[in-house]
């Protein structure tokens, strides 16, 4: 039985029926209807009229009341929006079910911005929602208020949303691209009206809204998620009383997921016993933070296709704002749960025509878009297309699994829809880029996603508005990072697109430190974005949180996650750890059994275990030599049409992957066909030579030996060919006179630079540079008095003794004189 609110695989990208607009008991079908009956529309308009009639704009003393919107105009606009919604609903009705419809409620509301008036101490509602700052003559673009508050009345409750501009959304190099007469037109910057915040008085609430042309976005408390957007876009952002539609759905109880984590493991999901690791721990003095705990930055570029541009009234400004609104929502999800900020570096809009074929086949679109992405000049960790197309596919997005940081595989294609729905779809496809799998229903009990009405983001049930990753998804991301993936995510932006603002978590011009809204640095070290007197740093793995001083050079700040990674050490002059680098492709690893490739140690054993579980292993060499040369289903180097391609003897270890101890189903991907069990009696024992075609969503068959896997002495696989490592034409690091890379005192990184052992320096690591003080000085306790203090004390003591002696002598001499001249004081002789 499906949980309430779940739908069949595909997330819903359009609106749903209004509870208040039912056609009466017994008159409407239980499920979605092809189109709403006219009485339902009229009832919605009647519900809207009282709100419009009673709306008023707070005015200063003596100001005239503004005229209310004409109800006929508003009703006409509302009916037009609903008609469009009906058409879309009819097209997508197959993606819905009755339980979801009953779990969603909608209302019309008139939100207002809270402002202060002269001689007033409290906020008052103001029905102009625009957040542009006044007096902007010195700016060449609209600048929005750093903070704003909005009041929304809906579902019998009043919500006050306190917002702060999300200045971490756009990079300092953010650019917008569109086309005119076949040429690319670039514009730096753009309007930034994207906010994060909370519901006033509600603990652990979250808000992500944009204020360009009305309110677009979501907010949530412990019970419900609310989506809001204007009924219609307008060019007059100063208009009053703009009706918005607000939708309410049940929210999950995510906090419970992180409690009572299961420690039961299984062969199929060997990572589950490690879930206890996900518990939050109190910060100790300079804890050793792993790659998951460290904040990461995914630099994203969005491309909008031509139909998306047409949908937004052929306005590239509106289209760009839509993309930024979606990424603002995604950023709020990722930073909260994955310790990853999603930073928008560019938005490209195809204003004249599509630059690839837009088809209903997402696999073909993904391959075509990957080729297009390689022509894009802008730097990005991932590039994703938003297309107004309906895929003939079980999901609404597709991306390359684990492809982030790759110019070829760091891409995805996503269906267009309402902002919240597109945000979920984009969250899913980006998660695939980050090595997070889809979760079939069979995994749900182990992953303990207990959303009360649906499920978590990566569930295959197609929940429409989930904002939570399950603990399995979080663990898979951690495992992806631990295997060496995502090395490009650790370059922290140094400045923002918007003007300097204290409190946004980025150190900008005029600031010495910035703790951010979620305090991430040590409070004693940073006050009002200035370092405390005597402090050198305020945050980072290389900042001592008690002394506020840099850790000494050679202090380990980021552990190597595997034998192909490079341990990073503090430099002694920064609080931040150096960039996350790994060894150059071709280094040996795993006791010379594997080769490093893209930061991972590639062996056939590792690949078999990743696909089939911890008990699996690579088959004997005899299996590869015998089967892969035959060119059959049991062994081959690929397929040409209907013909299996035999491997040459030179390439047998780069063909079909043959393993032992396969499980019934793979840990990743889907079986294409069946497992092909094969065994031989060889050298007095039976050897297992089984294989299978395991296909990912992006059509990649991981049933073949991976690129980078060793296939002979100083040789590795590439495109199912066994090649000399020297033939890969990789940039080399400096060699010394003996031919040793980095003088034998360092390793060559993926950037073709020498990373020296911390007692050596120079571009070739040939300069000895011993660490003078590798460990911080130990506290020796209270020190004794200095020699100067002893001398001063001795002198003072001597003077005091002399004074006492002289004083006593004088007193005694005086008494003697008295006894000598006073006859009455004389005693007998």
Curated annotation (Swiss-Prot):
Keywords annotated in UniProt: Cell adhesion, Cell membrane, Cleavage on pair of basic residues, Disulfide bond, EGF-like domain, Glycoprotein, Membrane, Secreted, Signal, Transmembrane, Transmembrane helix
GO MF term set: metalloendopeptidase activity
Superkingdom to which the source organism belongs: Eukaryota
Annotated transmembrane regions: 790-810
Annotated InterPro entries: ADAM_Cys-rich (IPR006586), Disintegrin_dom (IPR001762), Disintegrin_dom_sf (IPR036436), EGF-like_dom (IPR000742), EGF_extracell (IPR013111), MetalloPept_cat_dom_sf (IPR024079), Peptidase_M12B (IPR001590), Peptidase_M12B_N (IPR002870)
Stretches of the chain found on the membrane's Cytoplasmic side: 811-829
UniProt tissue specificity: Brain specific.
Segments forming domain Peptidase M12B: 296-493
Domain Disintegrin: 499-585
A Gene Ontology BP annotation from the UniProt entry: cell adhesion
Localization annotation: Cell membrane
Cleavable signal peptide: 1-55
A cellular component annotation (GO) from this entry: extracellular region
Quaternary structure and partners: Can bind to LGI1 and LGI4.
Descriptive protein name: Disintegrin and metalloproteinase domain-containing protein 23
Organism field: Mus musculus (Mouse)
């Amino acid at each position: 039985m499906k949980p309430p609110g779940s739908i069949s695989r595909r997330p819903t990208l359009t609106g749903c029926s209004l509870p208040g607009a039912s056609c009466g008991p017994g008159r409407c079908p239980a499920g979605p209807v092809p189109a709403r009956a006219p009485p339902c529309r009229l009832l919605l308009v009647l519900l809207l009229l009282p709100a419009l009639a009673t709306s008023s704009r707070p005015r200063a003393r003596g100001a005239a009341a503004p005229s209310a919107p004409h109800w006929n105009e508003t009703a006409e606009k509302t009916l037009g929006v609903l008609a469009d919604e009906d058409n879309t609903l009819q097209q997508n009705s197959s993606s819905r079910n009755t339980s979801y419809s009953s779990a969603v409620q909608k209302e019309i509301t008139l939100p207002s911005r809270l402002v202060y008036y002269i001689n007033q101490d409290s906020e008052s509602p103001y029905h102009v929602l625009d957040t542009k700052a006044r007096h902007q003559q010195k700016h060449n673009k609209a600048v929005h208020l750093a903070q704003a508050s909005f009041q929304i009345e809906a579902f019998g409750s009043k919500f006050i949303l306190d917002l702060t501009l999300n200045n971490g959304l756009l990079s300092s190099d953010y650019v917008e691209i569109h086309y005119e007469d076949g040429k690319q037109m670039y514009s730096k910057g753009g309007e930034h009206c994207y906010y994060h915040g909370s519901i006033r008085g509600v603990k652990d609430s979250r808000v992500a809204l944009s204020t360009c042309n009305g309110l677009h976005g979501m907010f949530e408390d412990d019970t419900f998620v609310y989506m809001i957007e204007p009924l219609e876009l307008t060019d007059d952002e100063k208009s009053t009383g703009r009706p918005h539609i607000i939708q309410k759905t049940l929210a999950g109880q995510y906090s419970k997921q992180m409690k009572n984590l299961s420690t039961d493991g299984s062969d199929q999901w060997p990572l589950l016993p490690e879930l206890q690791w996900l518990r939050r721990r109190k910060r100790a003095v300079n804890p050793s933070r792993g790659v998951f705990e460290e904040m990461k930055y995914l630099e994203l570029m969005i491309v909008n296709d031509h139909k998306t541009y047409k949908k937004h009234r052929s306005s590239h400004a509106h289209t760009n704002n839509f993309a930024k609104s979606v990424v603002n929502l995604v950023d709020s999800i990722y930073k909260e749960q994955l310790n990853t900020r999603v930073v928008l570096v560019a938005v490209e809009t195809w204003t004249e025509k599509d630059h690839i074929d837009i088809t209903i086949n997402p696999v073909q679109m993904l391959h075509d878009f990957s080729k297009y992405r390689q022509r894009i000049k802008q730097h990005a960790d991932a590039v994703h297309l938003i297309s107004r197309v309906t895929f003939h596919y079980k999901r609404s997005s597709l991306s390359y699994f684990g492809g982030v940081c790759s110019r070829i595989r760091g891409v995805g294609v996503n269906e267009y829809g309402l902002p919240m729905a597109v945000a979920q779809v984009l969250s899913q496809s980006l998660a695939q880029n980050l090595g997070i799998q889809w979760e079939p229903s069979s995994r749900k009990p182990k992953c303990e996603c207990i959303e009360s009405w649906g499920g978590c983001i990566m569930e295959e049930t197609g929940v429409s508005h989930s904002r939570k990753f399950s603990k399995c998804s979080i663990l898979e991301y951690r495992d992806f990072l631990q295997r060496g993936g995502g090395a490009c995510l650790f370059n922290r932006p140094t400045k923002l697109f918007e003007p300097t603002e204290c409190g946004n978590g980025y150190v900008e011009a005029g600031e010495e430190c910035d703790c951010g809204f979620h305090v991430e640095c040590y409070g004693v070290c940073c006050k009002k974005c200035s370092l405390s007197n005597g402090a050198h740093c305020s945050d980072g793995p290389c900042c001592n949180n008690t002394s506020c001083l840099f850790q000494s050079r050679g202090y380990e700040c980021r552990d190597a996650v595997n034998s192909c990674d490079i341990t990073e050490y503090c430099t002694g002059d920064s609080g931040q750890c150096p960039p996350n680098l790994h060894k150059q492709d071709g280094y040996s690893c795993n006791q010379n059994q594997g080769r490093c490739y893209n930061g991972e140690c590639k062996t056939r054993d590792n690949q078999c275990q990743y696909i089939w579980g911890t008990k699996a292993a690579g088959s004997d060499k005899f299996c590869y030599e015998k089967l892969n040369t035959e060119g059959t289903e049991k062994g081959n180097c690929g397929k040409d049409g209907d013909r299996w391609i035999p491997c040459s003897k030179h390439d047998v270890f780069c063909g079909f992957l043959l393993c032992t101890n396969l499980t019934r189903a793979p840990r990743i991907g889907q079986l294409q066909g069946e497992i092909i069990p094969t065994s031989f009696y060889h050298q007095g024992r039976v050897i297992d030579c089984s294989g299978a075609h395991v296909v990912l969503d992006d059509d990649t068959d991981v049933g073949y030996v991976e690129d980078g896997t060793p296939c002979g002495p100083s040789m590795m696989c590439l495109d199912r060919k066994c090649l000399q490592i020297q033939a890969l034409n990789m940039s080399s690091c400096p060699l010394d006179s003996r031919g040793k890379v980095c003088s034998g005192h360092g390793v060559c990184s993926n950037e073709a630079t020498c990373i020296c052992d911390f007692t050596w320096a120079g571009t070739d690591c040939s300069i000895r540079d011993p660490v003078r003080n590798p460990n911080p000085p130990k506290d020796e306790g209270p020190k004794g008095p200095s020699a100067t203090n002893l001398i001063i004390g001795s002198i003072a003591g001597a003077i005091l003794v002399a004074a006492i002696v002289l004083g006593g002598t004088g007193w005694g001499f005086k008494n003697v004189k008295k006894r000598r001249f006073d006859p009455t004081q004389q005693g007998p002789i």
